[in-house]
Design a protein with these regions (language model features):
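Short, surface-exposed "cap/lid" segments of acyl-processing enzymes
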Residues: 42-102
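Conserved hydrolase catalytic core segment
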Residues: 150-164
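Histidine-bearing beta->alpha loop at or near hydrolase active sites
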Residues: 101-103, 274-291
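Active-site nucleophile loop of the alpha/beta-hydrolase fold
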Residues: 166-178
């Protein structure tokens, strides 16, 4: 996917057009239209473990369950391949959360905050903990990463036991897109950005990204970076690993370094693995126009490592 940002060429025009906030040309084939909502009850029912296993047995409570959080402007589609892997392996469950404001309509997205995005992760975790699941894991891709890191700064996991580990895939703490920093300066002048998608990606991501949500994204990653610089204390019993591609047009690889230095254990460090790939969220291959055997191998290896850690 490629982004196109609508910016005035001459900054002197900013004042003159400050009242402009263009509305994108949305049609009914786009997720932005609200015609293809991922938030309908049937969709949520089959993707959330807390819903489709309403009354877990003791065996199910002892089976690992991983809450999978997708990235900015994406949907649960981003983790479908992990879900299919788990369904085949039958050793763990995947609970695919739809971030608040996502998978609905452009209007819903535009009015959402990063705290609203995060709320679905928190809610599913609390429900699983209350149902007695003893081996809960979290995984987040891209923006799902800082959303999960922010939960580590709260009392959530002390109040609701069960968290055993966290896997972050291409987490964004520093953006590779330097134009993103202009969002705070230009504000309403920016309006929105447009994302170019393959046929296989259409209907799974928002085409248009309102400047209001870009500002929320910047607020989230800026706050997360500051929290990491101060240090975030994590109990030794919670495992954590970051997988980060070395070439990434969305999340700068230095994000992995900041997370490594910022997560504080008493007697260990988090694990970090730099992945030889140019794909952002290399674990999501479906919908891409070009996939190599190396891409497939990296995805399989990562899923197997996650499974092994959860089931050992």
């Amino acid at each position: 996917m490629k982004n196109k940002i609508y910016l005035p060429v001459i900054f002197g025009l900013v004042t003159a057009i400050a009242a402009c906030n263009p509305t994108p040309p949305i049609d009914d084939t786009m997720l932005d239209s609200g015609k293809y909502s991922f938030a309908v009850p049937d969709s949520l029912q089959k993707r959330l473990v807390s819903n489709y296993i309403a009354n877990p047995t003791e065996v199910q409570k002892n089976t690992p369950v991983i809450i999978a959080a997708h990235g900015y402007s994406a949907t649960t589609f981003e983790w479908d391949e992990l879900r299919e892997y788990a369904d085949s392996a039958k050793t763990f469950y995947v609970s695919q959360v739809l971030l608040g404001g996502h998978g609905r309509s452009y209007t819903d997205f535009k009015s959402s905050t990063w705290q609203i995005w995060q709320s679905s992760i928190r809610d599913e975790y609390v429900k699983l903990s209350q149902k007695g699941y003893r081996k809960i894991y979290l995984t987040g891709s891209s923006t799902g990463g800082p959303l999960i890191i922010q939960l580590l700064t709260t009392t959530l996991f002390a109040e609701s036991p069960g968290l055993k580990g966290i896997f972050l895939i291409d987490p964004i703490v520093v953006s590779s897109d330097k134009q993103l920093s202009l969002v705070g300066l230009l504000g309403p002048v920016l309006g929105y950005t447009e994302t170019e998608m393959s046929d296989g990606e259409k209907g799974k991501w928002y085409v248009y990204r309102p400047q209001e949500t870009l500002r929320q994204l910047m607020s989230l990653i800026d706050l997360t970076r500051r929290e990491l610089q101060r240090g975030i204390k994590v109990p030794d019993e919670i495992y954590m690993k970051v997988y980060k591609t070395v070439k990434d047009d969305a999340a700068d690889p230095v994000s992995a370094v900041l997370i490594y230095n910022g997560i504080k254990y008493d007697n260990k460090h988090i694990d970090v693995e730099m992945i030889d790939s140019r794909l952002h969220v290399f674990t999501r291959l479906r919908g891409r126009t070009e996939i190599t055997e190396k891409d497939r191998s990296l995805q399989r290896k990562t899923f197997r490592e996650m499974e092994a850690k959860m089931t050992k």
